[in-house]
Amino acid sequence: MIQQETRLKVADNSGAREVLTIKVLGGSGRKTANIGDVIVCTVKNATPGGVVKKGDVVKAVVVRTKSGVRRNDGSYIKFDENACVIIRDDKGPRGTRIFGPVARELREGNFMKIVSLAPEVL
């Protein structure tokens, strides 16, 4: 679960390497985000010449969490790291590539472009 002040790895080539969560979107008192939820972040570490710069405030969708998520068939899926993909307002990714696997739960959130760019969907 991702909450305020959580640092996440960025799993795309938008130029950001690491982001810090400012807010979890979706409700007035919402505290935590899981896979497929949108968060507001600030870029803490970025590569030179990227689309986003250090200090930029961006929206991102969570694609991997250490705590994992329970599926309807009773199985759980967990990852080794917390990771997100920086998105535009139309739910499309700001970068052109996605690194690492993403969870199938992104399909339910209509993040189809991220799912199609990902090398593996678990």
From Swiss-Prot:
GO terms for molecular function: large ribosomal subunit rRNA binding; structural constituent of ribosome. Pfam families: Ribosomal_L14. Signal peptide: none annotated. The lineage of its organism: Bacteria, Bacillati, Bacillota, Bacilli, Bacillales. This is Large ribosomal subunit protein uL14. Belongs to the universal ribosomal protein uL14 family. Part of the 50S ribosomal subunit. Forms a cluster with proteins L3 and L19. In the 70S ribosome, L14 and L19 interact and together make contacts with the 16S rRNA in bridges B5 and B8. The keyword Transmembrane does not apply. One of its GO terms (cellular component) is cytosolic large ribosomal subunit. The keyword Membrane does not apply. Coiled coil: none annotated. InterPro entries: Ribosomal_uL14, Ribosomal_uL14_bac-type, Ribosomal_uL14_CS, Ribosomal_uL14_sf. Binds to 23S rRNA. Forms part of two intersubunit bridges in the 70S ribosome. Keywords: Ribonucleoprotein, Ribosomal protein, RNA-binding, rRNA-binding. HAMAP family: Ribosomal_uL14. GO terms for biological process: translation.
